Amino acid sequence: GRHWLDVVRFGESSGELTVNDDKPRSNAWRFRDAVIRALNEDVPFDQFVRFHFVPDKKNKELGQFIHLGTRLQDNANPNDKQFHRLDDMVATTGVAFLGISFGCARCHDHPVDPMSTEEYYQLTAMFWDQVKETPKAKRKTIPLEINEPRVLGKGSWRSPKQTVQPGFFKVLN
């Protein structure tokens, strides 16, 4: 199980760089134990992968996979948090399940990447409802600037472009 947990970037804590800010994730063990249980029960790999995105009752903890990524501090701008979490979900999905890195596609089309910028944001649109950032910060409220999936110019929420619908990238179709 340890190797799979490494692939999906599992961590028992928030991963903050300073010791005082590195907080344990109270329910992270549920995902870890579900991975170990599924592997010990020889769950076929196609089912194991499917349970990460659409878990059944017995394997519902495997659905936590998509929420295991980075967590920015509570006082961080919710717009930054929203798009960093979406990027983390897409990046982890690409590396863990497809063996492909999508790093460049967030900001620009790249000649050797299999995904265009628009296709990248279509993939983030698939995870859009999974990211529920509360627009708050210490002593003030910061509104969410973007409330629907969009292509972002140079990967920044400050430069929204056209809206996108959920979709996958053409190279695998």
Residue ranges and their predicted role:
Residues 1-153, 159, 163-173:
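Short, structured secondary-structure elements
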